């Protein structure tokens, strides 16, 4: 896409496997007020599995069924400046290499998103998301028809 972006311009980037109601206008505004090359939306999410704590003898001392994770995740809605292309080397992983490289130069920001986010990585998630859509109860649908 580099040939389609003007030098000095910013552009939006997202993954194709997540749905969210990220406020794009606020994301762009946050990106523009900082001196970064890229900004991604970050949110808390729930564990896909039950989380346990154990004592030294492996006796379970607590069990939290699919509790909220402590750290935030990149939920995949991003604003990038043209300069991001200076950090991309060939066909390496954008998440594993490019974003880490940008972060190492103190040019990567995270925009706090406290709204809806759901990845669609499994068949079960696809069924649930399609059900929400069919029931006209999709939290990510923030536009009017």
Regions found by a protein language model. Give the residues of each.
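A short, conserved acidic/glycine-rich loop-to-beta-strand motif
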Residues: 34-44
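Short, glycine/charged-enriched secondary-structure capping and boundary segments
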Residues: 1-2, 25-29, 53-56
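Active-site nucleotide-sugar/metal-binding loop of Leloir-type enzymes
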Residues: 1-10
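A structural signal for short hydrophobic beta-strand segments in well-ordered beta-sheet cores
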Residues: 51-54, 110
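Catalytic-core segments of class I nucleotidyltransferases/pyrophosphorylases
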Residues: 11-12, 19, 25-32, 45-46, ...
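Small/polar loops that bind or transfer phosphate-bearing groups
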Residues: 15-16, 40
């Amino acid at each position: 896409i580099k040939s389609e972006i003007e030098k000095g311009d910013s552009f939006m980037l997202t993954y194709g496997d997540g749905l969210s109601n990220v406020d794009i206008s606020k994301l762009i505004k946050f990106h523009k007020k900082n001196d970064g090359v890229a900004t991604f939306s970050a949110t808390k999410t729930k564990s896909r599995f039950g989380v346990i704590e154990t004592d030294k003898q492996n006796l379970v001392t607590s069990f939290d069924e699919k509790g909220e994770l402590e750290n935030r995740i990149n939920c995949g809605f991003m604003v990038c400046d043209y300069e991001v292309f200076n950090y991309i080397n060939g066909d390496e992983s954008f998440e594993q290499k490019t974003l880490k490289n940008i972060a190492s130069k103190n040019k990567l920001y995270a925009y706090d998103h406290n709204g809806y986010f759901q990845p669609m990585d499994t068949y079960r998630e696809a069924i649930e998301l399609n059900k929400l859509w069919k029931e006209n109860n999709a939290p990510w649908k923030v536009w009017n028809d």
